Each structure stands twice: as structure tokens, then as C-alpha cells.
């Protein structure tokens, strides 16, 4: 049987990590003082709709008209990316999963049915009983920029 898990930012947030856009925006506005003129303009211009990462993406889309200079915009983009990487690195370093969390997570990975509702659990069990699976192959796609999953599973972040 093949099982695929797709993990996004909600996974990190469920681990109590401050990896949402509001957290990064607060970091940008409170902590980043030595900045380019363009980043300063962006921080001043994007003050509303700071709840979702898509809000930042939309704001950046609108903000591209702030310069007609591609080189200046590239520099701004890499500056913003560097701040994001530094922020996520600090958040990532704070995360140290307990043995209890590691064990629970590994158990959850292999016994998905315990989180299903009654009807879905019934269908799942009927499906499993109809087929004879000799093994479970579990794949994970993570869309996060942290190594939260690797820490929980005890894996090298460089795989």
C-alpha cells in the first residue's frame, strides 16, 4: 500500500512554531532596521492584509511597480529572501521535539485510520480487508523551509 503525506506550513504551526506570515512580518517590521530603500518602502506600503503568505505574495506583485529597475528589484528580492531564511533558521533552531512527540508522530504515520470519522474508518477498513498488502510504502512531500519533519523522524536534513 502506498501512502502519501503532503505537509505545509500548518504542520510547523501545529508544532507551535512561529512560521506564519504574521510572524515574519512582525520580525521584518520590529527587528530589521538596516535595510535597502526598497525594503523600507515595502514595509511601509504593505501594512494591511498581513495574515497569509498569499497576502505577501499579492503585496509583492503590486509592489513591483515601485521600481522600473530590474537590478534593484532583484537585489530587493534577494534581500527579502535572506531575511526570510534568517528568520526561519532562528525559528527552526528553537524547535526540539520531545521523545513523546517523536513516538506519537511515527505511530500516527503508520496508523492513519485512528483519525478518520466513523464512516471513513469503515470504508478504510473495508478497503484494507479486501486487499492483501504486504507492506506500507510511506512518502512525504514537505512544502516547508524548515527541517521540522526531519527532526521529528530523526533524519538528516540533507536527504
Where would I find each of the regions flagged by the language model?
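Active-site periphery "cap/insert" segments of enzyme catalytic domains
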Residues: 3, 15, 19, 23-159
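Alpha-helical structural modules in large enzymes and assemblies
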Residues: 12
Amino acid at each position: 500500500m502506498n501512502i502519501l503525506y503532503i505537509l505545509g506550513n500548518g504542520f510547523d504551526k501545529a508544532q507551535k512554531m512561529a512560521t506564519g506570515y504574521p510572524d515574519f512580518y512582525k520580525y521584518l517590521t520590529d527587528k530589521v532596521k538596516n535595510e535597502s530603500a526598497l525594503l523600507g518602502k515595502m514595509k511601509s506600503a504593505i501594512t494591511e492584509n498581513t495574515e497569509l503568505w498569499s497576502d505577501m505574495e499579492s503585496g509583492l506583485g503590486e509592489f513591483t511597480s515601485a521600481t522600473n529597475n530590474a537590478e534593484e528589484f532583484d537585489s530587493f528580492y534577494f534581500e527579502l529572501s535572506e531575511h526570510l531564511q534568517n528568520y526561519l533558521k532562528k525559528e527552526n533552531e528553537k524547535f526540539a521535539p520531545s521523545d513523546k512527540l517523536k513516538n506519537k508522530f511515527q505511530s500516527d504515520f503508520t496508523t492513519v485510520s485512528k483519525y478518520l470519522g466513523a464512516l471513513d474508518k469503515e470504508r478504510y477498513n473495508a478497503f484494507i480487508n479486501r486487499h492483501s498488502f504486504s507492506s506500507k510504502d510511506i512518502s512525504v512531500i514537505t512544502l516547508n523551509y524548515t527541517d521540522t519533519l526531519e527532526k521529528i523522524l530523526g533524519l538528516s536534513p540533507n536527504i
